[in-house]
Amino acid sequence: MLKGKTALVTGSTSGIGLGLAKALAREGANIVLNGFGDVEGPKAELQALGVKVVYHGADMSKPSEIEAMMTFAAAQFGRVDVLVNNAGIQHVARLEDFPPEKWDAVIAINLSSAFHATRLALPAMKAANWGRIINVASVHGLVASPEKSAYVAAKHGLVGLTKVVALENATTGVTCNAICPGWVLTPLVQKQVDARALAGKISNDEATRQLLGEKEPSMQFTTPEELGELAVFFCSPAANNVRGVAWNMDGGWAAQ
């Protein structure tokens, strides 16, 4: 379905981003990877799916590096057809104790980076009259939790940005939608489970049950693969008129 097209996925060397990149690659999209840590492993996994893969290590908190990444992607493949704004970080603290520099970092990476990348991707998408912008928000783009002020503010902002971009391009072949996951078992979340087990002197299974039981009625993690299938749907002809949606895949979290 996406053969000959290019997908740029920010924060895609592991976790949700890598799952999304794999799903798009299985549909034939060439991939621009971005992120930190191991690059060669994810790159090889994607290349094994028969697509071209390149990497750019832009720091998503820096607009100049985002611009360099978008220029690089265009030089490699002509244009970005599918932009997935997935890069994100977290910091947890009560508001009065929240370090201002952490607030700025979360807003820069979780929200502003999507603005910068989208602004730069749109002209070529509009010229081609086809494009898909997929913002990875969170259930925290719909609801809130204590001690996550910056994250919740950024993800609510990302949902708002999604709607504006969708409306501004509603008569074109460019769509913009958001994915709002609940708990996803990524290496980052596994660390939270491990820490909870250690602190409570309980098993990892019990720590997992506690984590899910607090928020997610299904008592199941969403998987990166499931999120990837939703991204593929957004790219399909069936989703041509799906515009400005914040689609939660959260096991019933936001329904409560």
Over which residues does each language-model region extend?
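Active-site helix of classical SDR
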Residues: 118, 154, 162
